[in-house]
Amino acid sequence: MQTRTAQILVSLLFLTTAISSCDKKEVSPWNQMTEVNNQIVPSVFPERSFVITDYHDVKDTLYTNAINRAITICSEQGGGKVIIPDGEFLTAPIRLKSNVNLHLSDSTVLKFTTDPFFFDLVQTRIEGIDCYNISPLIYAYGETNIAITGNGVMDGQADSSNWFSENRIRGIVQEDGKKINEKTLLYEMKEDSIPFKERVFMRENGIRPQFINLYKCKNILLEGFTLNRSPFWLIHPLLSENITVRKVKMQSHGYNNDGCDPESCRNVLIEDCDFDTGDDCIAIKSGRDEDGRYWNIPSENIIVRHCRMKDGHAGVAIGSEVTGGCRNVWVENCTMDSPELDRIIRIKSNAMRGGEVENIFIRNIRVGECKESILGFELKYWHVDDGPYLPYFHNIHLENITSKKSQYVLHLDGFEDKIQARDIFVKDCTFDGVMKPKINKVTGVENIHFENVTVNGQDFKGV
């Protein structure tokens, strides 16, 4: 209740300030983006270097001990750069610590074992649900001033012989004949209100882990490297702030292979990255159902710019685990182009997850082609249209978007009997090659504005 009251007071203060300044000059949301950008300051580190090969025991087939020991010593001595030199190295999960820049040299290939025996238990969140699970390939909890940099490659080695085996994806047959996998078990634990400390998935039944999971961390820099073959989401900052993800290449087409998913994070910059993924390229999240309401922390002040998206379920998505809300997102100067890219912008939730999504600004997007729609809303995601926690999407702006090929422009799937999405503005957009221009589904949405919009060369006034 106190948190909600504080949010209302902050909103009133913002409104009062805005009203008092109306006579002077209208504040552009893109000027606000500049202010947020100025608050996102990349991490800096002392000029100290620790090379992992100096800590390696030749008896070890894995470099895990060498890497983690170098990280610990570096952190204890005040920080610096832990260098993984040119060459190929095999490791188990790595634990990042404060004031450490884990640096991959230009010709480094860092491979991660797929043997669950080497994966310790850590606190994390899987698809918005809190639990204890086997460690992500790179993990940090409560650390400050951390980085992964360099032009090397990190390979999770996930394929159908390990993380994507039939048993892990489809599940195994239980004694009662029911076929279930570990992720579904976690869903059931959440539905049964089992406390998160009892939602434990050990080595023998661990849920596929994220590649990089940075939990409750501050001042994060991820720059330059390539990620391949992840078991699950690739980059997952969680309950963290002041994050820069720059010039990272994400190439991974496995199940649930989202590219970058900031969850309940504040002040995030994602720029000049390449996405070629098996799920959403970027998906902004803030918890799911009861767990999301317990934390009640939105994702806010997120900037995406100068990125390139190929395959994926969406170029930029918000949700579906967005119970804590999402506000103040800017996406600009991106290119998105693939027959296997489903949607350009996608916002999704349902009546059990809820969440308020507001102040979303998109401009200067070049689309070669996408499989379905330019803008998609799903307020009944997973066909859940009945529940006490209605999502609410509003103040969404699209400007200067061009597309050469899509099935349709809009697919705004709201509730049949209520309005839970409004104030959508589409301006200065050109949509060509629209195969079904008259099948723009708009349900449960009001106050949609079109200005200088053409579809297949014809002026488009509305739906």
Predicted regions and their residues:
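Extracellular "leader-to-stem" segments immediately downstream of a signal peptide or signal-anchor
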Residues: 2-7, 11, 20-83, 88-101, ...
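Alpha-helix capping and helix-loop boundary segments enriched in small/acidic/polar residues
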Residues: 58-61, 257, 261, 265, ...
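Short, T/G/N/S-enriched strand-turn elements that build extracellular solenoid repeat scaffolds
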Residues: 71-74, 90-98, 224, 233-239, ...
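Short glycine/acidic-rich loop motifs that flank beta-strands on beta-rich extracellular proteins
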Residues: 79, 90-93, 113-114, 134-135, ...
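Active-site-proximal loop/turn and secondary-structure-junction residues that shape catalytic pockets
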Residues: 88, 239, 286-288, 320-322, ...
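Right-handed parallel beta-helix
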Residues: 106-107, 144-152, 218-228, 241-252, ...
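Active-site capping/gating regions of soluble enzymes
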Residues: 343-348, 358-360, 373, 389
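Structured C-terminal portions of repeat-based eukaryotic scaffold domains
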Residues: 374-379, 391-398
